Amino acid sequence: MLALRPEHHDSITLRIEAEPAAEAEDADDALAGAEMLTLDLTVQHGDALKAAARKALPKQKDIEAWIAPALFADAQLNVRFVDEEEGRTLNHTYRGKDYATNVLTFSYAETEDDPVAADIVLCCPVVEQEAKDQGKPLRAHYAHLIVHGALHAQGYDHEDPAQAEEMEGIETEVLAGLGFPDPYADR
């Protein structure tokens, strides 16, 4: 389903369904036992984001394709692309850090049983500079950070080494399945 939200000229709502991989003897058995996951995805662009910057951003269908294999539950996600000022304001307001960061995830689930619902905010100038500094294609860096944000939305974190290893392993596996290199290979 594709629906334009007329009250937001810069938003598109897209609903997709994905099937998690299942171990089965053949494809028919796998499909019969597979649970369908649903993603309600909205993409927004900050008002101050310049038109030239918007042209370099991933398309809705790409974002959908990157998030789907990283989902382990139904999800309602909003991906928002912002300029440096909005990114810095959000990081300062919600994390007490007075600088723009590459990605922020605001998860609205209060318990593990709550549905996955979150805003994933990407600061375009920071993402672009990081990709340049790290010698990575911008598309690959956006894919990585969007998958990273989707995992945060589902409760994954990287506060300690064991958590980081688990989360980075999932990111690497998802990105490899999408044809992107290991984002942590150069460490």
Swiss-Prot record:
Gene3D superfamilies recorded: Metalloproteases ('zincins'), catalytic domain
Cofactor, how bound (note): Binds 1 zinc ion.
Short name of one Pfam family: YbeY
One MF term in the entry's GO annotations: RNA endonuclease activity
InterPro entries, A to Z: MetalPrtase_cat_dom_sf_prd, YbeY, YbeY_CS
SUPFAM superfamilies: Metalloproteases ('zincins'), catalytic domain (SSF55486)
Subcellular location: Cytoplasm
Binding site for Zn(2+): H148, H152, H158
One GO biological process term: rRNA processing
Keywords assigned: Cytoplasm, Endonuclease, Hydrolase, Metal-binding, Nuclease, Ribosome biogenesis, rRNA processing, Zinc
GO cellular component: cytoplasm
Enzyme Commission code(s) on record: 3.1.-.-
Cofactor: Zn(2+)
Described function: Single strand-specific metallo-endoribonuclease involved in late-stage 70S ribosome quality control and in maturation of the 3' terminus of the 16S rRNA.
HAMAP family associated with the record: Endoribonucl_YbeY
Similarity-based family: Belongs to the endoribonuclease YbeY family.
Protein name (record): Endoribonuclease YbeY
Source organism (scientific name): Ralstonia nicotianae (strain ATCC BAA-1114 / GMI1000)
Lineage: Bacteria, Pseudomonadati, Pseudomonadota, Betaproteobacteria, Burkholderiales
Gene name, Swiss-Prot/TrEMBL: ybeY
